[in-house]
Amino acid sequence: TATPLREEEVVRTRFLERADILMTSLMNLCFGKSARDCWNTRYPLATGPYWDGDAVVWDQGAGLSGYVALRGASVGVSAYEKKYADLTDRMFNSINRFITTDNKRSAYAVYPQNGNERYYDDNVWIGLDMAELYEQTKENRFLEKAKMVWDYLMVGNTSSCGGGILWREIPAYSNKHTCSTAPA
């Protein structure tokens, strides 16, 4: 006779089923529809006079965060573990298209080219996801990106306003936001 599932296993399975349906739908509608193979701003894909329809970095980070959480939750569940592990390279490459090197530091920028804005809060959340991916996989490439973000955050860490990390790189206003300081 089969061993009945414990309640937490039933809940986890139900959660994963629903999360998988949502992520699969989102990816089918809003991921990989352009040459950059990343998250798109709208469904259906729409371009405008200033941008090609790919989402800006905070939306890329949100998609990455959802993926990382689902990937972690799927470990040990054969129906989902391989599916989400197999997407790791694609998600990693997608977000890394937004890395720029300005002011002698590499970090994730709003758009994927040098000379545009970079925000400390967007970077800290991506850095946390990279650290989580490292914890899940033990692959150094994720740890390297988390360290890159940490090095960038330390440039924005000032003693003004009682200390903390600035919200935006340039212009470096003296304001600090919880979204950039608290997670760091």
Predicted stretch roles:
Residues 1-3, 184:
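Residue-level recognition of alpha-helix boundary/capping or hinge positions
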Residues 3-113, 140-164:
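Low-complexity, Ser/Thr/Pro/Gly-enriched N-terminal "stalk/linker" regions
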Residues 52-72, 118-134, 176-184:
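Well-ordered alpha-helical segments within folded domains of soluble proteins
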Residues 103, 118, 131-135, 153-184:
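The feature captures the catalytic groove of carbohydrate-active enzymes
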